[in-house]
Amino acid sequence: TAQRDMNAAVSCERVEEIFQKAMSDLDAVKPGDIEVTFRLIGALEATQDVDLTKDSYLPEYVTWIPTTSYDLQEDATVYDLYTKAIGEAGLRSIGEENDYVRTIYAPSCLGGYALSEFTNGARSGWMYTVNGTHPDRGLKNWKLKDGDVVVWHYINDYAHEAADWFDDPDYPALGDGTYYNGWLRAADISPEQYVQQLLGKILKVGKNGTVE
């Protein structure tokens, strides 16, 4: 009998715990919440400065956080989304508190290197798009709306790769559009999946003895 009473008490405590968790979850979803998506696209470290005016050398873009949905309050900014996404992914970055991200550290499975402004060349750095367009302000000053699609991406050579700066004389678009939005060519998969695919390619040796 004593054992049954103890089991019943434990069960009641468990039910109460589950109930409190459910109420907490309901409180967290308040009317007016918005749902947005976020994707983070980095790049491999360059072995030379990227300058698409001179040659076609371009480090590969790699997704660091695949497209993920996030629930935020209706007055949330890109900063709120960015810090939530980076934090949940366990990544580190520098500068967001000052409204300009200078550095993001790659996922550990990719080596954890620091990818910063100018790492891959004089016109390289971090940018972001909302619904496909680069906003004209910092991440703390852009409010999000329900359904917004945010892509935070590295750019190796903004003069050749950013398609939406035609009217800004300080950032003239160069080239013929060949390299526009190159970061979007990265597969929308986790960095772990990218590494697995890369290892698979390395291990797949063709009949002629070369790596395919």
Residue ranges, per PLM feature:
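Beta-rich interaction/scaffold domains
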Residues: 1-33
